[in-house]
Regions:
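Switch II (G3) loop of P-loop NTPases
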Residues: 144, 148, 167-182, 194-217, ...
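Conserved GTPase G-domain signal focused on the G5
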Residues: 123, 160-161, 271-275, 285-307
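Conserved P-loop NTPase architecture
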Residues: 1-157, 190-192, 200, 298-304
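Anionic-ligand binding region
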Residues: 187
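Conserved nucleotide-binding/hydrolysis micro-motifs of P-loop NTPases
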Residues: 13-14, 51, 93, 119-120, ...
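Conserved C-terminal guanine-recognition region of P-loop GTPase G domains, centered on the G4
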Residues: 190-196, 214-283, 288, 303
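Glycine-rich phosphate-binding P-loop
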Residues: 151-168, 183
Length: 307
């Protein structure tokens, strides 16, 4: 299972202490000569292409930046502390402990200062007093990772979602005849006309009377996709299956169905004795490769039109 939600503690560095010392200009004139302290380090959340979930945070949940250096005599400023960078995957939502969104890190190389370092204390240069530095900031935050897919495949067990996913992405995710082969969301890029879009395969949806809270928890990753693809491999029961899937999503969070484009895919069309006349259906056969390119084109055109 992917790790997609953790709580972390961040603390930026306090400013460096200002220096208090005397500077003798002549035998009769003495002034303050202490320099300002350096700025404390920020704690910065940074989107990294090398992270695909939050598993790294299992072993470390506290991130503390260094304090700025003390000011020096002869009005020399203390060295500023380096910023502390915390790498997160693209698609991470940062929330406070009340679950309010602070920032959505959904762009490559995006950065966000979650705790700002304190400014350095004033030295006593040309005056007879110094001022204390500012302390660093402390914050607990929730990192809520939502897979940045644009298309998601949904279905009950043994509908052929993973086979379609493999065909579109040229991946080799596990496929078997027994149910619940896919245990965790899978995502990869699909190419069309030299452009890429991200598609996601999901575990089979369980009906509420037989599902634990954890099993359908992957539905939280429907937050980002613009297209929901409902998949069935049974020509006799596909309408009922699609209704069940929508009902389970609505039960989990009805907002996940809002502002989405829905596709309805009927797999295993090579086994049908009679072809359904439902115009909403996209008929494909993964076994024979039939309809895959049509589906790829429809997905791309819909995404391209929505931008």
């Amino acid at each position: 299972m992917i790790v997609d939600k953790v709580t972390i503690y961040c603390e930026s560095g306090s400013g460096g202490q200002g220096c208090t010392c005397d500077l003798m200009l002549s035998s009769r004139r003495i002034i303050g000569g202490g320099g300002r302290g350096g700025k404390g380090g920020d704690v910065v959340l940074r989107v990294s292409p090398h992270h695909s979930d939050l598993v790294w945070f299992r072993g470390r949940k506290e991130f503390i930046a260094h304090a700025g250096a003390r000011g020096e005599y002869n009005n020399r400023k203390g060295k500023e502390a380096e910023n502390f960078y915390v790498n997160v995957p693209v698609g991470t939502i940062v929330r406070d402990l009340q679950e309010n969104i602070i920032v959505d890190l959904n762009q490559k190389n995006q950065e966000f200062v979650i705790c700002k370092g304190g400014h350095g204390g004033e030295g006593n240069y040309k005056k007879f007093y110094s001022l204390p530095p500012a302390p660093g900031e402390e914050k607990e935050a929730i990192l809520d990772y939502r897979i940045p897919a644009q298309v998601v495949f949904l279905g009950l067990a043994n509908g052929g979602k993973t086979s379609i996913f493999n065909k579109l992405t040229n991946k080799n995710a596990k496929v078997a005849d027994y149910p619940f082969t896919t245990q965790s969301p899978l995502w990869a890029d699909c190419e069309y006309r030299y452009r890429l879009f991200c598609v996601m395969d999901t575990p089979p949806i369980k009906e509420s009377h037989e599902a634990t809270h954890e099993h359908n928890r992957f539905l939280r990753h429907l937050y980002r996709p613009k297209i929901l693809v409902f998949v069935s491999g049974n020509v006799d029961t596909y309408k009922t299956e699609f209704k069940k899937i929508k009902a389970e999503i609505a039960l989990f969070d009805a907002a996940l169905l809002e502002d989405k484009t829905c596709f309805y895919v009927l797999n295993k069309s090579d086994t049908f004795k009679k072809t359904p006349k439902d115009k909403k259906l996209i008929l494909i056969s993964c076994a024979r490769g039939k309809g895959i390119e049509t589906l790829r084109e429809k997905l791309f055109n819909t995404l391209n039109h929505s931008q």
